[in-house]
Amino acid sequence: MANLLIDDDAVTVSLSVIEKAEALHGDVRVPRTAVVRVRAVPDGMAEVHGLRMPGTGFPGVIMVGTWRDSEGVTFAVCHGRRPAVVLDLAGQAYDRLVVTVDNPEEAVASLP
């Protein structure tokens, strides 16, 4: 499972070696100032829409990589229908990050 690392300056989605292969992408790092909204959701997969390009997806099982739709570009790391953190971003390559985590409320509390 990916780790959501939060420090004073940035938020980093740290991927495992397998997730990097699934996503065809490395870790994603964005400045904290780019985060315009953050929320916890009960099912991260329900937040990811559009066409996968590139990445890996099996409905209800895994969504890792980039998804594009009319609302923008989402980078997702979702394993099963589990709780996740959704970060809406401004001025970045991705419009949203969706990451399944063990305790999404804790991550939300540590961000603006």
Tell where the protein language model's regions lie, with residue ranges.
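Conserved beta-hairpin
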Residues: M1-R32, V36-R39
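Acidic, Ser/Thr- and proline-rich intrinsically disordered linker/docking segments
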Residues: A23-R32, V36-P112
